[in-house]
Amino acid sequence: MQHLVIRRPDDWHLHLRDGGMLRGVIADTSRHFARAIIMPNLVPPVVTSADAATYRERILAAIPAGHRFEPLMTLYLTEGTDPDDVEEGFRSGLVKAVKLYPAGATTNSSSGVRDIDKAMPVLERMAEVGVPLCVHGEVTTADVDIFDREAVFIETVLDPLRRRLPDLRITMEHVTTKDGVDYIREHAVNLAGSITTHHLIINRNAILVGGIKPHYYCLPVAKREMHRLALREAAISGDVRFFLGTDSAPHVDPLKECACGCAGIYTSINSLSCLAHVFEEEGALDRLEAFTSLNGPAWYGLPPNEETITLRKQEEPVGYPAKIETEAGPVTVFDPMFPLYWTVIEA
């Protein structure tokens, strides 16, 4: 197959940052994606509907002329989040979800939840109203190995929360383990999972073998090969509970290439080329549209996009920049470690 026409995709987990970084990266998403769930972990974080409204205006102002893109706003859950504000923001159409960051789990998560019981009033209201909860599914206690954080989170936090609030709709974001895939499949009600582009391609060897490679370091960290294969199987399965959330997360190179580098991989610019490669490799190009364009909208109660894009397979590898320049500084682009032949020719 040399051409593939799919509905215009959406990204159900995206970091745009703010200021000069926002202005430097947004075009790589808005060029091909119609909508994206925008992560709220700014400094300071997006904790109220008013915060979300002003951040949304900054995003809209940064979208290049001619690009049609809708940012879908989220709130950063804290132990003091106001249930009334969440409900009002959701009912107004501004707020699409609330994000749970366990404190210390990832970039700018220090304001996150340390005691889930203290967030129960807002979680109970969300269950009543139908507001989705997006979770960064890792525990952060020092006694848990970093490669086990997701599995332990499922057992000690997610499963008890779902039993306590069975009506709460939960997105387990950036699933990285077979444990996560299996848990979603075994619990069909009010639970879904997003999968990143890079976790379909790299395992932990990419970070550690032959020297430490900071541009493959992300959180949740890439796991063993068995987990990568489980993610691939889930992504290509057509199962409506799994959909694309790139977790594209730009950091300037000096903050990655240092003694204590930031977690995050920038994939917005070449995600669709990478995904077409993966799905072709798995003999599943006919299911790429479900993963990128259909399953996510169905989960979030939105219609799929009417517009389409066309992917074409070239005879020669497709070029993409090794870095992009932003007002904040240079950002290294994800290198999948294989040539890419698929490119978007219409959007």
UniProtKB/Swiss-Prot annotation:
InterPro entries for the chain: Amidohydro-rel (IPR006680), DHOdimr (IPR004721), Dihydroorotase_CS (IPR002195), Metal_Hydrolase (IPR032466)
The UniProt record lists the keyword Transit peptide: no
A molecular-function term among this protein's GO annotations: dihydroorotase activity
A GO BP annotation: 'de novo' UMP biosynthetic process
Cofactor note: Binds 2 Zn(2+) ions per subunit.
Gene3D superfamilies found in the cross-reference section: Metal-dependent hydrolases (3.20.20.140)
Active site feature: 247
Class of the enzyme per the UniProt entry, highest EC level: hydrolase
Matches recorded under PROSITE patterns: DIHYDROOROTASE_1 (PS00482), DIHYDROOROTASE_2 (PS00483)
Cofactor list: Zn(2+)
Ligand binding (substrate): 15-17, 41, 136, 219, 251, 263
Family: Belongs to the metallo-dependent hydrolases superfamily. DHOase family. Class II DHOase subfamily.
Protein name: Dihydroorotase
Organism per entry: Sinorhizobium medicae (strain WSM419)
